[in-house]
Amino acid sequence: MKKISNYFKPYKGLPLSIYIIFFASIVNNVGNFVGPFLTMFLTYRIGISIGVVGIIVAINAGLGLIGTMIGGYLIDSIGRKKVLVVFGVAAGIGYGLCAFINDPIIITIILMVSSFVGGFSHPVYGTITTDLTEGKQRNAAFSLNYMALNIGFSVGPLLAGFLYENYLMWFFLGDAITTFISIALVFVFVPETKPTKVEMEKSKTKALESAEEGSLLKALIKRPTLLIFSFIIVIYFIVFSQFTFGLSIQVGDIFKNNGATIFGSLMTVNAVLCSVLTVFITSATKNIKAALCIAIGGLLYALGFGMMFFIDSYYMFIISTATWTVGEILVATNTSVYIANHTPITHRGRFNSVFPIIRKLGFMIGPMMAGFYVKYTNIRNLWVLVAALALIGSLMMYKLYTVDKIKVEAIQT
């Protein structure tokens, strides 16, 4: 028991607000009913054609990203909690209203508006986590955020599916209520963390987090390391996007009629491992720099996805999934840490709003690239390309790690 408790040591002694955000995030993610079922709702419940639904879903995602960008600026300008309360509550009200409206056009418009205003509050949790932590505590705190996401998404879709089929009104009300509960937890128990002028002055002693004046673009230009990092992470997400695209095609190609069942089971393996292993991996890597962890994650992507070039058995697919899942945990928990450690104290909200766009970009390019490549070769050859990209990304990340190490040593001397 003592050995097991040692794995939880990194999570002890964190600020109370971090634990509140952890529970608030679980509640919010468990109640994320509408998003995952939006396509199904618009197609089968409202009766919109698939072509139009595709356009609506794309616009909905775009509005959410625009809202996130604007929200990042407001978070830095007026404060974290104000943005969360005003725009988070507005989004929740929108979802709640859909429970009592029958007009499909009005429902569609409300859902799109809710996605837009809800996007404003998306960077809040990450920004507060950055404000309240530094060093090893920051690794543990972002690891908790990642666990909350996985716990929520392990339970949420099951509950959402049940409500969608049997109690549609509560499908919308449940999303709204869990949104309100999560916001209430943060509003009551978490203080405003927007840096004061004194804290901004103190930040000048931290070369990588010192205050900056001007726009997000100006701050990025002054930090070329973050620009390079953003490019590398796009490569990582191009690779990672194949867990839904390339993997589903290969499993269907090999297992035919059982393909959907086997693909679903591999997704379950991924979800369970993400929920269970995060604590142990965070503890094992607590003394390793975020950049190096991400580089190791890239190697595991190369191995886990690359081995699909030659495997055929279900059990080998489980091993493959387990391998790239460990890589996913390393990349996901340390990417936020790296961004936080290199973000000026004055621009934390804006920098936290950029990451979802980087992720979306990778997930947009990945399937398109893979589809084109497979069209002219075959599905197995895709994994050679994916493994090569993962290796390139990993090597670039390791180079970034060495550059950062030299910079830190120069500052300390």
Regions inferred by a protein language model and the residue ranges of each:
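Structural signature of the two symmetry-related core transmembrane helices
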Residues: 82-96, 292-306
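A membrane-interface helix-boundary motif in multi-pass transporters
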Residues: 164-177, 372-390
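Helix-loop boundary and gating motifs at the non-cytosolic
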Residues: 7-61, 225-232, 236-257, 262
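Helix-loop junctions on the cytosolic side of multi-pass membrane transporters
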Residues: 186-201, 399-411
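Residue-level signature of mid-helix packing/kink "hotspots" within the transmembrane helices
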Residues: 33, 61-69, 153-154, 271-279, ...
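Juxtamembrane intracellular "pre-TM" segments in multi-pass secondary transporters
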Residues: 1-15, 193-229, 413
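Helix-to-loop junctions at the C-terminal end of transmembrane segments
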Residues: 67-79, 277-289
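Cytoplasmic helix-loop-helix junction between adjacent transmembrane helices
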Residues: 112-151
